[in-house]
Amino acid sequence: MEPTPFPSWQDVASALVATAAGRAPADLVIRGAKVVLVQTREVMDGWDVAIKHGRFAYVGPDASHCIGEDTQVEELSGHYLIPGLCDGHMHIESGMLTPAEFTRAVIPHGTTSMFTDPHEIANVFGLRGVRLMHDEALLQPINVFTQMPSCAPSAPGLETTGFEIGPDDVSEAMAWPGIVGLGEMMNFPGVVNGSQQMLAEIAATQAAGKTVGGHYASPDLGPAFHAYAAGGPADDHEGTSETDAMARMRQGMRSMIRLGSAWYDIESQITAITERGLDPRNMIICTDDCFAKTLVEDGHMNRAVRHAIDCGCDPLIALQMATINTATHFGLEREIGQIAPGRRADMIVTRDLRTLPIEVVYARGQRVAQFGECLVECPHLDWPTDTRHSVNLGKSLTAADFEIRSDAAEVTANVIGVVENQAPTKALTQTLPVRHGVVEPDGIAQIALVERHRGTGGVTNAFVSGFGYGPGMAMASTVAHDSHHMIVVGTDRAMMAKAAMRLGEVGGGITLWQDGTERALVELPIAGLMSDRPATEVAAKVTQLVEAMEAAGCTLNNAYMQHSLLALVVIPELRISDLGLVDVRTFELTPVLP
């Protein structure tokens, strides 16, 4: 299926001018609304907007001269009209949905623009996978822009991916329609140390006049941070404190503050605006990672904006951070992010700016959602057969594959420590018993990274603490940021083998086993990352998974996200990869048993 290009301003400029002047009728006129102008931080009561060919032609006190015989007229007295919301940084794959189904889920929440970084699928299928995501994105009735992933692998030499991304791939992608920049530059040590590959990717992006996304996951705000800023990233979403936000803005970067399914970083950073008084133009609200369950039950960008307001932010400033600031950051302020002539007619009808109930959503001048229901088709790509067969284990796994052996009576082990509601882990040590030559978890859990891209049969084993799991369980997932092999966590090695083999059977997803039976299964057949079923169906299965995790003893908030991040070898302190245990503080492999 080929996308239908949305007309450019140049294509329709004459019609927009004629409509605004009253020489040609508008397609749609909305009258008497409280129009929110984020460009001036004003609310204009009783204003009208006139729309032609999906763009705003006239925005002002009286659009009666734009009304013709066939013009659709809607009265909105007493209601606010605000720009459609923009998510400045996010990964569609985190919703475990295809671009089409993710779009269908967020439209009723008022999201009309998304800036996506498909680096999850890049690790599985490389540039081809990115293009497939991008092609489906271009089919959607809202604006789904793509940032070309920068880091596959995220940490060269510390993990192996299905495919790698390099400067030539970045240069090629910069010529695709709808590409807005380079995705988050996670290899911050590479930038700081002058990696020629990383700098070449950044240079290719800047040469194309596009935006470089950042990712500085370190508390060090000394010379390393300044070197990273000098390397070209234009934004960063990894801050967790007011100090982090201020440091980024002072270095000319935009601070992206996030509220996702597992990230709660708005409250701790927005005080840089609300209390310290820094210029809010340099702060952007984003979600980063949102599960289908969150989208179905809680919302998307509307949830994040409401949270910012609840944290003391002026509603108009919060809206700026989710509209015009984002558009300006990506050089699209002439296209999206404000209700003004020439821009795409993306807008939301709401009766209250603080609680932000989303009543009606328009995208490109068309009503796309009303009272929580998506009214438009979100077309699917015909995904190639091989993308649905991406789990290649190479052999039948048994309990013996998950053994960590020692000749001692007890050992001191390096242990990954999970921290609730935070991406960073703690590097812990724990004394563990050895029985019959096998190290036993003894109150914690085992973790394994099972290679699934090349069918090597490789299994890397270690230990993890903090989930609270009881005996006889295992959970496996092919969503294993960022290399997306397979993470298996369990307290029973036989269950770990069963869980891993089950995902090989279904082509990927998440499964939880307890006492010999499967208690939950979320099938993710596309790249082992996504389902092309509706968000409501995926969310229902995720709910079953969460209930099964709780029954197995885990009560952490959003524990699944913590599970999926245990192989993300660019976020401190301790992670696992197919090459071994990784100390992210030093970016070196470290033994499980020192």
From Swiss-Prot:
Catalysed reactions, semicolon-separated: adenine + H2O + H(+) = hypoxanthine + NH4(+)
GO MF assignments: adenine deaminase activity
Cofactor dependence: Mn(2+)
Keywords: Hydrolase, Manganese
A GO biological process held by the record: adenine catabolic process
EC number: 3.5.4.2
Protein family membership: Belongs to the metallo-dependent hydrolases superfamily. Adenine deaminase family.
Record protein name field: Adenine deaminase 1
Species in which this protein is naturally found: Jannaschia sp. (strain CCS1)
Gene of this entry: ade1
